[in-house]
């Protein structure tokens, strides 16, 4: 009886779990927008925001061997005179021509390139000495827009900053002879509050705007101070890797800068096709579905995050070889993250901009690598068809929400779930009957 049960279980596994061959198997379907990370808006829509390294990307990437070895990450040390404004202090530094678009609040709606979005900074209701008036170990963060005026803001940028390049900077004291409090707070406390609604073509968002003069260096110990000028939002982390259209952003899962990394939840999977193609174990103790692609493989033949990372790095190496790009440009490519296949037109335009910067526009003519999957598979990037992913029809738009059906959890129809329980039930019955008979034999 036990043998027959095992045989039936094996047959069911072969029938239900036979790896499928997709009409258009996706070994690595990715898009490469200019954004570094994605963030979620209400409703779970995937958005991208740019960390802009224009206007001189090629110049400062090709003049140095590696970006990680430059002063971009650590800032620049500079001597500044007492009572010098931050805008004046950064003149002649690497940050002078740096435009940074930073979003620290995931409640914003999508914005255009002409919009300059500033960080989420706590302010008091009446513009008093709240967080914006404190320097702390990290220095005071301030946005500089087209002159000697600095802005510390939450919500909407000042109107005069719309469409202009700006610098989001922090000033950090580096010596004891430097700054007592980092920056003077007297002028900051006089900032004006403007609680209004900020509207773009994509919608409106309410926010508090605090307009302040540029902060001034202050010290009673010496005539000059030593400080470090750093970008407000540093270079993004190394890429997270995920399969196209098979992930969503987990709500409230953001790093310290407010940027969401790629994370799976159960609603992001295309259902039965994903399970059949990527493999799972139908049996007691086996994984019904691959809930998270975080390096821990659940199921037979499912690719891990490291697998995908290796593929992407291999492709980048091919780009390097084919186009003889400099190492600095390759590092720039590695720092460009990707989002799901349902890219907006804006992102597709930005893809072309990257191609112009890196002189690989011909390689980026298509937004995904779907046309080259066959070649990639022949080159060994896909170990087998079970390592490829079948794009669902239609493409699922990731959402964040509650699971309200069994198929969303298992990716499997209810009748398959019932078959599983029936098989497990038969096994339990066989084990119980066999145990009772064995117990009776022992008692005799």
UniProtKB/Swiss-Prot annotation:
Primary subcellular site in the record, as a coarse category: virion
Give the subcellular location.
Virion membrane; Host membrane
What happens to this protein after translation, modification-wise?
A: The inactive precursor F0 is glycosylated and proteolytically cleaved into F1 and F2 to be functionally active. The cleavage is mediated by cellular proteases during the transport and maturation of the polypeptide.
Q: Which residues are glycosylated?
A: 110, 359
Q: Where is this region: Fusion peptide?
A: 277-292
Q: Which residues lie on this side of the membrane: Cytoplasmic?
A: 435-444
Q: Name one GO cellular component term.
A: virion membrane
| Top-level division of the source organism's lineage | Viruses
Show which residues form the site (Cleavage): 276-277
Where does the signal sequence lie? 1-17
Q: Spell out the subunit comment.
A: Homotrimer of disulfide-linked F1-F2. Interacts with Hemagglutinin esterase.
The protein's name in its UniProt record: Fusion glycoprotein F0
Species: Infectious salmon anemia virus (isolate Atlantic salmon/Norway/810/9/99)
Q: Tell me the classification of the organism that encodes this protein.
A: Viruses, Riboviria, Orthornavirae, Negarnaviricota, Polyploviricotina
């Amino acid at each position: 009886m036990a043998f027959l049960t095992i045989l039936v279980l094996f047959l069911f596994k072969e029938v239900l779990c036979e790896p499928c061959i997709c009409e258009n198997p996706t070994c690595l379907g990715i898009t490469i927008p200019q954004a570094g990370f994605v963030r979620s808006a209400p409703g779970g829509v995937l958005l991208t925001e740019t960390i802009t390294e224009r206007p001189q990307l090629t110049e400062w990437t090709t003049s140095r061997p590696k970006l990680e070895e430059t002063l971009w990450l650590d800032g620049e040390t500079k001597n500044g005179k007492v009572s010098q404004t931050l805008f004046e202090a950064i003149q002649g530094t690497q940050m002078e021509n740096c435009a940074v678009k930073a979003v620290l609040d995931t409640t914003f709606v999508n914005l255009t390139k002409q919009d300059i979005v500033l960080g989420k900074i706590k302010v008091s209701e009446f513009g008093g000495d709240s967080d914006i008036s404190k320097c702390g170990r990290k220095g005071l963060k301030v946005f500089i827009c087209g002159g000697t005026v600095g802005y510390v803001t939450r919500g909407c940028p000042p109107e005069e900053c719309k469409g202009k390049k700006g610098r989001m900077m922090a000033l950090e004291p580096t010596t004891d002879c430097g700054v007592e409090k980092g920056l003077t707070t007297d002028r900051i406390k006089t900032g004006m509050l403007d609680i209004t609604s900020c509207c773009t073509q994509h919608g409106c968002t309410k926010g508090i705007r605090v307009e302040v003069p540029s902060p001034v260096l202050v010290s009673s110990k010496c005539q000059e101070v030593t400080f470090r000028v750093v970008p407000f939002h540093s270079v993004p982390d190394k890429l997270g890797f995920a399969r196209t259209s098979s992930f969503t952003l987990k709500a409230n899962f953001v790093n310290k800068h407010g940027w969401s990394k790629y994370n799976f939840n159960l609603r992001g999977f295309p259902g039965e096709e994903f399970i059949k193609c990527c493999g799972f174990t139908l049996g007691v103790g086996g994984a019904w579905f691959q809930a998270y692609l975080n390096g821990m493989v659940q199921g037979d033949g499912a690719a891990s995050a490291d697998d995908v990372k290796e593929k992407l790095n291999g492709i980048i190496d091919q780009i390097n070889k084919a186009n003889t790009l400099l190492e600095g440009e390759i590092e720039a490519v590695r720092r460009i993250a990707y989002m799901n296949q349902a890219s907006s037109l804006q992102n597709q335009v930005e893809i072309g901009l990257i191609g112009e910067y890196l002189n690989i526009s011909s390689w980026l003519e298509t937004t995904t690598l779907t046309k080259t999957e066959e070649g990639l598979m022949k080159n060994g990037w896909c170990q087998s068809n079970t390592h490829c992913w079948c794009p669902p029809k239609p493409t699922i738009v990731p959402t964040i929400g509650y699971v309200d059906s069994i198929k969303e959890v298992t990716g499997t129809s209810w009748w398959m779930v019932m078959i599983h329980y029936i098989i497990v039930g038969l096994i339990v019955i066989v084990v119980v009957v066999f145990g009772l008979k064995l117990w009776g034999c022992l008692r005799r």
